[in-house]
Amino acid sequence: MPTTFTLLESSPTLTHVAIIGALDLVGTREIELKLTASTAGRHKPVIIDISQVHFVASAGLGLLIQIARSLITDKHSTILLAPNQTIQQTIHVSKLGSMLRIALTLEEALEMAKLPAVSIVRT
């Protein structure tokens, strides 16, 4: 099954997309350009529903980081909605929680989208 994404909302204040499938090397390549244009290209806070993503490889994580970094420059947040336990642990262990915020419900994600993104300070 190919990896796909759907644009759920594109308002003046928010972008909301849903990804279905695996964010492995092949799946990431299938959606990378269009997903980046639909999210980072809009320069608005983004909610990425990954409730139907069962696997994220390094390529998929890299894509999510790329989107988040692009939005952080505009002080906008990238929120991952309803990731499975494995993906949550990957974000936590990788110390990416300030860049890729996790929300378990849409209501929580919408509240997070109102907050400015935290800049990542490198030491």
What are these language model-derived features?
Residues 1-18:
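Short beta-strand/loop segment at the start of cytosolic alpha/beta domains
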Residues 13, 96-99, 105:
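Glycine-centered tight turns that cap/initiate beta-strands
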Residues 104-123:
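A charged, well-structured terminal subsegment
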Residues 22-100:
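Amphipathic alpha-helical interaction surfaces in cytosolic regulatory modules
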Residues 5-6, 45, 114:
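Short leucine-rich amphipathic alpha-helices used at interfaces
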Residues 11-12, 51, 107:
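Conserved catalytic submotifs in the C-terminal HATPase_c
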